[in-house]
Amino acid sequence: MVDDAKLFVHIFCHRQSAYLYEIQNEWDWMTKYFFTGGIMPSKDIFEFFDEDLTVVKSWQINGEHYSKTSKAWLKNMDKNSRIIKQILNHHYDEQNIWFYRWRIFFLTCEEFFKINNGKEWFVSHYLLKKKN
């Protein structure tokens, strides 16, 4: 990264806690199929990794916006289910299972991002720059 460069980061985050996505049991399908090896960062995650970069500015976007986005994606998916199932069939053996995994994923995201009026999980943007 050149000295005067800036980095813009867009993440989903939790208001307080960062946590790893680790499969807990056989029912933990969302972690297994969508988030394996991932992390849900906390809103202040970059404050803990500030050796090389510093946060110039940050913005939090209320989770209700992403809830509405997820709802719209589900509506669009249902409207185009035939084409989407063909696409899934090209990539997965079990197209219907994957179609319904995605449906439940969108439904879950819609609900999770509404919790606490969109203030529990939300989108954050960060502008970072190299430390001097």
Residue ranges and their predicted role:
Residues 13-123, 129-132:
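Substrate-binding/catalytic lobe of Class I Rossmann-like enzymes that use SAM or dcSAM, i.e.
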Residues 3-13:
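Conserved beta-strand signature within the Rossmann-like core of class I S-adenosyl-L-methionine
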Residues 1-2, 50:
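Short conserved AdoMet
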